[in-house]
Regions:
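Short, contiguous, pocket-lining structural segments
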Residues: 30-33, 46, 68, 72
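Short beta-strand segments at enzyme active-site cores
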Residues: 10-15, 49-58, 90-99
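Glycine-rich, proline-tolerant flexible connector loops at the mouths of alpha/beta enzymes
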Residues: 15-29, 58-64, 105
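Glycine-rich anion/phosphate-binding loops
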Residues: 1, 26-41, 75
């Protein structure tokens, strides 16, 4: 209520889950606790008039393949929405911020954008209620260009629901801008152009209209092992 009074209208809560098959991670208990925390936070937000962004992040650290990512993501999202229902959260007044379905960063077999898009959409349709107004993907350490390409391919996949699929990137939106700026006043104009270019790219990708390579980007991986805020 204090934050609402100060002008806030949206809040975000992130839980991070690492995939490590050999050590049974994430465990059923870890998923249950994370889902309950997210659902309770969402209910508290709505009671205060805030729109909750629910962020159950499946981190890309690891050697797991994309099918393992699918399995974990389906379990996590199914559990999250079970807890959201139990806590009386209004679906239409909330947003989901998940990771795209990708293999671990050190996986032996990589996946192309089409496979990533198809499995991501299938996972969402299996696990996320159609009443959800929007899904705002996190980038999770993939490069700026890949984040745009994957989102673009996702929005080309035929879907059964009208849930908006868009972006809520940090590193994949800001990296080239920050590298260009370097904290120096003389670089502000160039840095702003970099930021606008990535915003334009992701805006087009949200409509399935992005042409890969049409906007300047930092194509380096933004992955940071054990990344924390």
């Amino acid at each position: 209520e204090k934050y609402y009074a100060q002008g806030a209208r949206v809040a975000k809560w992130r839980t991070a889950l690492k995939v490590d098959v050999a050590n049974n991670c994430p465990s059923d208990l870890a998923i249950e606790v994370a889902a309950q925390d997210l659902a309770r936070y969402a209910r508290i937000c709505q009671e205060a008039g805030l729109v909750p962004i629910v962020e159950p992040e499946i981190m890309i650290d690891g050697v797991h393949d994309i099918q393992t990512s699918v399995k974990v993501q389906e379990q996590v999202l199914t559990t999250v929405y079970k807890k959201i229902q139990e806590n009386g959260v209004m679906l239409e007044g909330s947003l989901l911020k998940p990771a795209m379905v990708v293999p671990g960063v050190d996986a032996a077999d990589k996946s192309d954008p089409t496979e990533i898009a198809q499995l991501t959409v299938r996972t969402l349709e299996r696990c996320v209620p159609g009443a959800m107004p929007g899904v705002t993907f996190l980038s999770g350490g993939i490069s700026e260009e890949d984040a745009s390409i994957y989102l673009n391919e996702i929005n080309k996949v035929p879907r059964k629901t009208q849930t908006r699929l868009t972006f809520s990137y940090s590193r994949a939106l800001q990296s080239s801008c920050i590298k260009t700026w370097k904290g120096e006043a003389g670089n502000v104009d160039a840095a702003q152009k970099q930021l606008l270019a990535r915003a334009q790219a992701n805006g087009e990708a949200s409509k399935g209209e992005y042409v890969p390579g049409s906007q300047p980007s930092d194509e380096e991986s933004l992955f940071v092992k054990n990344y924390v805020y």
